[in-house]
């Protein structure tokens, strides 16, 4: 995951769930937290989050709380995706609506994810 603000990569992270034995160590959460720390604010409303996989419910909750400007993701996640696949957490459920673009280089992202998790598990 990468957080970009003003055309500059502010932070980047990858999934550390297995490495840390921590279910909350998703790439999105780690990248958002690092960006907030670097910028000195919990409001990232001028930043865009780029991720390989459509964010899950936990990550979408954090994305909304950080007030990220938009999410761009590669592969749709029909099992747990909460931008559009399983539910749209930021659409009408709160006063925070996060625009998203999905399916960017989807096959390439899906292949990256398959290889990553094959090596981790």
Say what each PLM segment does.
Residues 1-7:
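Short beta-strand scaffold segments in enzyme catalytic cores
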Residues 35-39:
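Conserved hydrophobic residues forming the short capping helix/wall of the S-adenosyl-L-methionine
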Residues 16-30, 34:
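A short, polar/charged loop-to-alpha-helix boundary motif
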Residues 41-53:
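Immediate flanking context of iron-sulfur cluster ligation sites
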């Amino acid at each position: 995951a990468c957080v970009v603000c003003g055309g500059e990569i502010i932070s980047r992270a990858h999934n550390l769930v297995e490495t840390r034995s921590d279910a909350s160590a998703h790439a999105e959460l780690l990248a958002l937290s690092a960006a907030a720390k670097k910028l000195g604010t919990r409001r990232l409303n001028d930043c865009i989050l780029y991720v390989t996989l459509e964010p899950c419910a936990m990550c979408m909750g954090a994305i909304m709380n950080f007030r990220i400007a938009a999410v761009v993701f590669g592969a749709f996640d029909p099992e747990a995706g909460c931008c559009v696949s399983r539910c749209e957490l930021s659409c009408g459920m709160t006063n925070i609506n996060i625009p998203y673009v999905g399916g960017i280089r989807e096959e390439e992202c899906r292949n990256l994810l398959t290889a990553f998790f094959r090596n981790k598990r």
